């Protein structure tokens, strides 16, 4: 079970975008994740009339390493860590500071 999943609210704790918040759009296999509106890069693309794509400079999100983000606890409005608890035979994710379940 992963500590950070898709649609979790995270905050960047290290790097050029430190302090920015966003939702996890995609979790990649090599401990990286794509966060909406964070770590934006510019890509120069050629037009492709067969696909109907316009050329130009496109801004898109680049992957961040999972160690540079922390899950955001909306109850305390701070970054938090994730732990696991077994309830009714199911493993659930909980915030370390409040021991309350993480709502995705």
UniProtKB/Swiss-Prot annotation:
One of its GO terms (cellular component) is ribosome. Transmembrane segments: none annotated. One of its GO terms (biological process) is translation. GO terms for molecular function: rRNA binding; structural constituent of ribosome. InterPro entries: KOW (IPR005824), Rib_uL2_dom2 (IPR014722), Ribosomal_uL24 (IPR003256), Ribosomal_uL24_CS (IPR005825), Ribosomal_uL24_KOW (IPR041988), Translation_prot_SH3-like_sf (IPR008991). Keywords: Ribonucleoprotein, Ribosomal protein, RNA-binding, rRNA-binding. SMART domains: KOW. CDD domains: KOW_RPL26. One of two assembly initiator proteins, it binds directly to the 5'-end of the 23S rRNA, where it nucleates assembly of the 50S subunit. Belongs to the universal ribosomal protein uL24 family. Part of the 50S ribosomal subunit. This is Large ribosomal subunit protein uL24. It comes from Pseudomonas paraeruginosa (strain DSM 24068 / PA7) (Pseudomonas aeruginosa (strain PA7)). The gene is rplX.
């Amino acid at each position: 079970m992963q500590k950070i999943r898709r649609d979790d609210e995270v905050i960047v704790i290290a790097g050029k975008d430190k302090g920015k918040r966003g939702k996890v759009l995609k979790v990649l296999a090599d401990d990286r994740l794509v966060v909406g509106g964070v770590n934006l890069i510019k890509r120069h693309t050629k037009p492709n009339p067969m696909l109907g794509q316009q050329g130009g400079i496109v801004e898109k999100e680049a992957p961040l390493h999972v160690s540079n983000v922390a899950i955001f606890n909306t109850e305390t409005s701070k970054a938090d860590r994730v732990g696991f608890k077994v309830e009714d035979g199911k493993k659930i994710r909980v915030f370390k500071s409040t021991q309350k379940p993480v709502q995705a």
